[in-house]
Amino acid sequence: DEVFPDEDDFGNIFYRQANMSAKGIPQIAVVLGLCTAGGAYVPAMADESIMVRDHSTIFLAGPPLVKAATGEEVSAEALGGADIHCKISGVADHYADDEPHAIKIARECIANINWIKPEQITRKPIKPPKYDSSELGGVVPSDLKTPYDVREVIARIVDNSDFAEFKQYFGETLVCGFAHIFGYPVGIIANNGIFFSESAQKGAHFISLC
């Protein structure tokens, strides 16, 4: 309270967000428009954030301020749109095509929250993968130096081939996400190429959620 003394402004919001995070209270942000200045910190501090293509933006200063400060003209989308934050900066975790898709992703995030105690895990009805596991020999090349998409492996292992991927477009050489195997909820981390710093950042974030 001494650090953030205001009662109604952003200092108080940041204080509460930080405290909720420390207490393990999940925070999911759905950005459906502009998040500017202090508002830009809210989705960045959330556990998971969702942005909508060509509709959501996150930045501390908008295009007019950028032009005033640097003389550079830049669009809001190029400055802080979904493509920037889902694919390059990693600030956002999920890329939605439209608002209904963003809400659908948010529901999936809530469904995957790790709040249930281990002894209370709910087992879902077992559904076989949509793709035959016998095809794995054709998916994974005999030469391990030959690249392949590990998602094709996951699709042949998890129930109903349903995989809720996390940060799909960021750190793409590491694939992370939630699924079910034999009805049990699982978190999956799979190598998908050369490991880069973005991949490590993504993996650490996912482990904290899982």
Question: What kind of region is each of these model predictions?
Answer:
Residues P5, F14, F59-A61, V66-T70, ...:
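Generic, ordered loop/turn and secondary-structure boundary motif
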Residues D1, G24, K67, H85-K87, ...:
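Gly-rich Lys/Arg/Thr-decorated short loops/hinges at beta-loop-alpha junctions or inter-strand turns
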Residues Y15-Q17, M51-V52, I58-A61, P141-T146, ...:
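Generic detector of short, locally flexible boundary/turn motifs and exposed helical patches
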Residues G81-D83, P125-K127, L209:
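Short C-terminal domain-edge/linker segments immediately following a structured domain
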Residues D1-P118:
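Conserved catalytic cores of soluble enzyme domains
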Residues G11-N12, D54-H55, P125-I126, F178-H180:
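Short hydrophobic/aromatic-rich motifs at helix boundaries and adjacent loops
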Residues K145-C210:
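Non-catalytic terminal/interface segments that mediate subunit docking, oligomerization
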Residues H94-I154:
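Terminal amphipathic helices with adjacent charged low-complexity linkers/tails
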